[in-house]
């Protein structure tokens, strides 16, 4: 089994392929070109067709800022290419200094054509919970958290704390936000209204249900609004 780091992923909503993947690609390209004074990104296929609705352009501009970024939604078809293909260009004094083609292959993962894909390391050699139980019994491991730390190292707890903090921030920010969600469908945010409304009957179970619903709306609306969230398969 792969690392827990491969399960929980932090990034911009609302789509692993249309926002998280492009965000990761833009972050990588920006790091490779720290001296660029402008960028250009050409989106193809599905990224071009639905990128505006997903906010792909907004996420790319946010990551590549403060340098100005030109986004082109191309209708060109590249034979044999992945449907979520992007071309990145770095500019310096009006001259192209670097380019990179990236494919957003789903799940927030990206691939650079022509480069060998780095295989995700198999951190856990066991393949079932029965095998994990036998291993823990043999090694006198009493909790699953001990088993996780043995395989992942103690730094996994810092990562999971970051995941938990991002989850909480998504709730907090979603409960405060107002207005219409991006995307052109004129959908009004509801989380703030839900958390501030008082039901006619103050039954504890109903109050708890209302709070849970408000939290769920808060995260969903942050996701829809290109907020930073945690995604998991």
PLM-predicted stretches and their roles:
Residues 15, 19-22, 26, 53-57, ...:
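Generic structural signal for well-ordered, non-membrane alpha-helical segments
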Residues 2-14, 146-147:
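Generic N-terminal amphipathic, Lys/Arg-enriched alpha-helix
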Residues 8-28, 225-233:
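Conserved phosphate/anionic-ligand binding catalytic regions in large, soluble enzymes, centered on
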Residues 22-29, 60, 64, 216-219, ...:
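Buried hydrophobic packing segments
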Residues 44, 55-64, 68-92, 96-151, ...:
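Mobile "lid/hinge" segments at catalytic clefts and subdomain interfaces of large enzymes
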Residues 162, 168-233:
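Accessory "access/gating" subregions that flank catalytic or transport cores
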Residues 1-3, 33-37:
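N-terminal glycine-rich anion-binding loops that anchor highly charged ligand groups
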Residues 36-45:
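Beta-strand segments within the central parallel beta-sheet cores of soluble alpha/beta enzyme folds
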